[in-house]
Amino acid sequence: MQCQDVHCVDWNAIDTHLLATGSADHAVNIWDMRKLDKSGKATPVYVLEGHTNGITSLQWYPGQSSVLASGASDSLINVWDISRIQSDSNDTTAALVFQHSGHRGEVTDFQWNATEKWTMLSVSDESQPSGGGTVQAWRVNDMVYTDEEKVLQELQQY
């Protein structure tokens, strides 16, 4: 399926035919297992590019089947929404909806909180002389995934 060194993989718990892989080539590949060719090989349905180093972790968001996040050696966590990609386009830049840049070192792991909407814990190897890493708790702004009209109505109150 993927030519480069694959570092991580995650099945979509809601759309179980979707699989995401992250690799050394800085890309997140989305695969649709219903689209295997006769020899059992697959071509990614989307290639998400927004990191400058290898992908170290990824996970689908438990509350929405089109959303996933990827962490990488570039110290970033990107949140993607593949429903924003035009069906007739190879341009996947619209899928990047949020980027967490709070870490100073390689992102080694993260977990979505299954009960707190858009909340995540992330771990980074800060590469300090004392060793060890950091854990951050953070939340993607709810307005990233709210319809524009609802956001405007809410902001007009202020």
Model-predicted segments: where are they?
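Acidic, glycine-rich loop-and-beta core segments that form the ion-binding/anion-interacting portion
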Residues: 1-36
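Residue-level detector of conserved, well-ordered beta-strand and adjacent loop positions
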Residues: 20, 49, 69, 101
